[in-house]
Curated annotation (Swiss-Prot):
This is NAD(P)H-quinone oxidoreductase subunit 6, chloroplastic. The keyword Secreted does not apply. It comes from Nuphar advena (Common spatterdock). Its main location: plastid. It is an enzyme of class 7 (translocase).
């Protein structure tokens, strides 16, 4: 990423400060769930450090593996702990729940409207003299990204939603016992 020097410096300072704040949150917060979310902030900031050095695949892999898998497992383990002392003042529906449900519902309906109307094959195919040809100069990493963002995009997202629903269901069942 060829950024001007001041923007590059601001980006690095903001990522570093996010890393420090997240690390302090992991250590200083008494609620283990908040501490796990702070570790997620730390992992996101670490993965974003790779972007200014043009290591996009490493950044994406770090986000998928550490934030998407490891941090979810940490949150899953924290949810199994006996957290009754943290939830003494349980409210059934709060303002934050309403705001979150409105945001999630609007994102869901915008995705439902956008996905069928998007030409996914138009992302990678180029047109030259009325022939549609695939770009020949792609590496294996680019081919993986191309196939994940075109051919396997919808199955990839459906699997992630199924895994998320099963995780939430397992947490809900473990909470009842």
């Amino acid at each position: 990423m060829d950024l001007p020097a001041p923007i590059h410096d601001i980006l690095l300072v903001s990522l570093g400060s996010g890393l420090i704040v997240g690390g302090l949150g992991v250590v200083l917060l008494t609620n283990p769930i908040y501490s796990a979310f702070s570790s997620g902030l730390v992992l996101v900031c670490i993965s974003l450090f790779y972007i200014p050095s043009n290591s996009y695949f490493v950044a994406a892999a770090q986000l998928l593996i550490y934030v998407g898998a490891i941090n979810v497992l940490i949150l899953f383990a924290v949810m199994f702990m006996n957290g009754s002392e943290y939830y003494n003042s349980f409210h059934f529906w709060t303002i934050g729940d309403g705001f979150t449900s409105v945001v999630c519902t609007s994102i869901f309906f915008s995705l439902i409207a956008t996905i069928p109307n998007t030409s996914w094959y138009g992302i990678i195919w180029t047109t030259r003299s009325n022939q549609i040809i695939e770009q020949d100069l792609t590496s294996n990493v680019q081919q993986i990204g191309i196939h994940l963002s075109t051919d396997f995009y919808l199955p990839f997202e459906l699997i992630s939603i199924i895994l998320l629903v099963s995780l939430v269901g397992a947490i809900a069942m473990a909470r009842r016992e």
